[in-house]
């Protein structure tokens, strides 16, 4: 286990692109490989795109999107067809020597904190054919439940999973449904800053 003090989570930047692409495409069958153009596209559409640094080196990353993203993933499309609001974890990937070191749980805590004041559910998918028991165990023990299944064009089967975010109900009722309420900036600002209409507390 790596000590928490040695890990830094930060927003991605363009200089990280080649590193994260290599990490993604050398992660085995649980993560689908993509090309550089598709990875670069995430820089434009992902509200949450953070990397974990250890001693100045990128050790992993997590990408999450919300429904307005222009993204053609069949799993993202499935969630858009079934839920009007959500934060979708597209992928969380670590280098081989940093797997099962606690970085995934740090990422999960961070994206959960991001999601629960913005959307009512957090969603993702896990491969069930071939079966990814590491991811299934992780998400099931974090309170995710299966919302559906589908077979991808490549023939692989996935479990589509979601987790209700109870804190969002408070945000919606206290701030978003009241025109006179002021929502603190940290609860709506993100790397794309797509919600400027909400009033800001400096």
Give the label of every model feature segment.
Residues 4-20:
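A short beta-loop-alpha structural element at the N-terminal edge
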Residues 63-91, 153:
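Conserved acyl-donor/pantetheine-binding loop and adjacent beta-alpha core of acyl/acetyltransferases
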């Amino acid at each position: 286990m790596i000590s928490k003090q040695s890990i830094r989570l930060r927003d991605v930047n363009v200089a990280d692109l080649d590193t994260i692409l290599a990490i993604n495409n050398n992660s085995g069958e649980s993560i689908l490989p993509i090309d550089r153009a598709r990875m670069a596209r995430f820089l434009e559409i992902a509200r949450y795109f953070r990397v974990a640094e250890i001693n100045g080196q990128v050790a992993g990353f997590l990408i999450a999107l919300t429904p307005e993203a222009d993204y053609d993933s069949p799993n993202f499309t499935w969630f858009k067809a079934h839920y009007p609001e959500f934060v979708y974890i597209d992928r969380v990937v670590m280098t081989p020597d940093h797997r099962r070191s606690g970085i995934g749980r740090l990422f999960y805590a961070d994206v959960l904190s991001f999601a629960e004041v913005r959307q009512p559910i957090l969603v993702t998918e896990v491969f069930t054919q071939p079966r990814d028991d590491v991811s299934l165990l992780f998400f099931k023990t974090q309170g995710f439940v299966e919302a559906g299944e589908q077979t991808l064009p490549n023939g692989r089967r996935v479990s589509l999973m979601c987790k209700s975010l109870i804190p969002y109900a408070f945000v919606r009722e206290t701030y978003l449904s009241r025109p006179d309420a002021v929502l603190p900036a940290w609860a709506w600002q993100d790397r794309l800053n797509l919600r400027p209409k909400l009033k800001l507390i400096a």
